[in-house]
Amino acid sequence: MGKTAFIFPGQGAQKAGMGKDFYEKYDTAKDVFDSAGEWLDLDMKALCFEENDRLDLTEYTQAALVTTCLAMEKVVEEMGLHPDVTAGLSLGEYCAIEAAGGMELKDAVTTVRKRGILMEQAVPAGKGSMAAVMGMETEKIEEVLADIADVSIANYNCPGQIVITGLAEAVAEASEKLKAAGGRRVIPLNVSGPFHSAMLATAGKELGKVLEGVTLHELKIPYVTNVTAEYVEDPAETKALLEKQISSSVRWQQSVENMIRQGVDIFIEIGPGRTLAGFMRKIDRNVKVYNIQTVEDAEKVCQELV
């Protein structure tokens, strides 16, 4: 038998209505949303289930998305489906750690709320930016970026999709040079800051202080960290990795490839959107990928796999 990984999306996957059907049908999910609302003093139902202007603001997005994904994940486990390893893209790593038993739900939700605020405040609006580079070899991108200051790779998503980040002018310059060097498309991203760039190192240090107050537990199963794409089995490493993660590249493709090498052949994306499933198809078409964003999805997948 192969192994199963639960994978969780990052910021950008959020959408109004996410998790509502889980809330209405399963007490487990209802408890997660209601508890998160109490801990954060936020109306989580209004934030996640109704059209509103706050869901796309980083300080709200992060808590809303982590709450939703973990509410779904707990229902899936209740149905009898369990992972052998977890991983999450950027923000999703907090879901991965909680699902692996390394962090309490309350700590995951309250920490990402603070993380969102720190990231929002780290760089003045408009000073930093990000762009997705499509259809270009990673080595070629790294070569072009090597000659430009204040820009770096934010995400190694999958073959043919790399995200760059940094000072707005540097990202603009890099975008032009990448197009000239053969990049098929370079798409500016609608984000509020230069995530996963050195410009967020100060926010990382502040997050480190927040994490000092968080109790980490022995992991029931390993999770894979974005920073190195390696398996983490010792909870003592988690805080330093999360502090570093804010200003480091997200090695998503490498993380997935590592899980496949370790015998994972079923990947279950839990949360709104199908972003990770899309990346998976470009990384390795031989593994099975399931996507759970509705109750119907969860019931269907669990019926097949449990």
Regions found by a protein language model. Give the residues of each.
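Non-catalytic positions within long, well-ordered alpha-helices that form the structural scaffold/packing
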Residues: E77, K179, I260-R261
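Alpha/beta catalytic cores of group-transfer enzymes, especially the acyltransferase/condensing modules
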Residues: Q11-A13, L40, A100-S247
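Short, flexible helix/strand-to-coil boundary loops that buttress conserved ligand/catalytic motifs
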Residues: C48, L145, S175, M280, ...
